[in-house]
Curated annotation (Swiss-Prot):
Parts of the chain in the membrane but not crossing it: 15-52, 60-92
Induction pattern: Expression of the manXYZ operon is positively regulated by the cAMP-CRP complex and negatively regulated by the Mlc transcriptional repressor. Expression is also weakly repressed by NagC.
Residues in the Cytoplasmic compartment per record: 1-14, 53-59, 93-100, 174-183, 256-261
Record-listed N-formylmethionine modification sites: 1
Subcellular location: Cell inner membrane
Topology Periplasmic: residue spans: 141-144, 210-241, 281-283
Any GO CC annotation of this UniProt entry: transmembrane transporter complex
Protein name (database record): PTS system mannose-specific EIID component
GO terms for biological process, alphabetical: D-glucose import across plasma membrane; fructose import across plasma membrane; mannose transmembrane transport; N-acetylglucosamine transport; phosphoenolpyruvate-dependent sugar phosphotransferase system
GO molecular-function terms, A-Z: protein-N(PI)-phosphohistidine-mannose phosphotransferase system transporter activity
Gene (UniProt): manZ
PROSITE patterns attached to this UniProt entry: PTS_EIID
InterPro entries: GatZ_KbaZ_carbometab, PTS_IID_man
Free-text domain note: The EIID domain, with its homologous EIIC domain, forms the PTS system translocation channel and contains part of its specific substrate-binding site.
Length: 283
């Protein structure tokens, strides 16, 4: 008796494929455009997996390519878990699971918004300013180590987020939606925002220097020594760094009024130069 049973080989992504997706994801923003934003970058990152799951250059491979040319936009580092989840979905679909294009794109769209809300405050509002402050503090002493330290630390975090994000998303599959659901994203975003504001508040007092040398009084003591009281002396007694803090609040108010940041910078230059020329501001 001849056994005519046909066996179908399960299609499985390898660690090499996942590393390929990770490496390509570093060029995520390379083809950004106003029409579909990061769609080309997402599709480019998925190519190693698509080649593995659809080895023949047939209609299935073409459909997989087209599937990932839909609109996509999120914080580029936290796109890694979305890539991982998409890898798991594509693998299941290639093995016969009933997963249509709408389901895959729906997962991508559903994750890209919440993760962008987490990635922006964490990376742009916290990680980068903290490492930049650390590097700038060292660079101000004349050391080249400052910018190098910033470059190395920031890229270590960036690469680790991308690599482990892809691996985590792939291992969890669609369960990642549940893991990052509920109040977790909100708490993480709130915590990162508070930390970022704390760091920026410390930087305002450290880096911003305003001196108002207008003389309020001159008093000569019994020894003949003259004591000069300026406006800046009084302000420092009330609250050190009060003027820089008020200027920061003014910038925030102008930004909320949609004033171009370039005009704010130019305005500060004009105020500083004019104030120094008139004697209202000092070094």
């Amino acid at each position: 008796m001849v056994d005519t049973t046909q066996t179908t080989t399960e299609k499985k992504l390898t660690q090499s494929d996942i590393r390929g997706v990770f490496l390509r994801s570093n060029l995520f923003q390379g083809s950004w455009n106003f029409e579909r934003m990061q769609a080309l970058g997402f599709c480019f990152s998925m190519v190693p997996a698509i080649r593995r799951l659809y080895p023949e250059n047939n209609e299935a491979r073409k459909q997989a390519i087209r599937r990932h040319l839909e609109f996509f936009n999120t914080q580029p580092f936290v796109a890694a878990p979305i890539l991982g989840v998409t890898l798991a979905l594509e693998e299941q679909r290639a093995n016969g699971a009933e997963i249509d294009d709408g389901a895959i794109n729906g997962i991508k769209v559903g994750l890209m918004g919440p993760l962008a809300g987490v990635g922006d405050p964490i990376f742009w509002g916290t990680v980068r300013p903290v490492f930049a402050a650390l590097g700038a503090g060292i660079a101000m002493s004349g050391s080249l180590l400052g910018p190098l330290l910033f470059f190395i630390l920031f890229n270590l975090v960036r690469l680790a987020t991308r690599y482990y994000g892809v691996a985590y998303g792939y291992s969890k599959g669609i369960d990642i939606v549940k893991d990052m659901g509920g109040g977790f994203l909100q708490k993480l975003t709130e915590g990162a925002s508070i930390l970022g504001l704390f760091v920026m508040g410390a930087l305002v007092n450290k880096w911003t220097h305003v001196n108002i040398p207008l003389v309020v009084s001159r008093i000569t003591d019994q020894t003949g020594k003259e004591h000069v009281t300026t406006v800046q002396t009084i302000l420092d007694q009330l609250m050190p760094g009060l003027v820089p803090l008020l200027l920061t609040f003014a910038c925030m108010w102008l930004l909320r009024k949609k004033v171009n940041p370039l005009w704010i910078i130019v305005g500060f230059f004009v105020i500083g130069i004019a104030g120094y020329a008139c004697g209202l501001l000092g070094l």
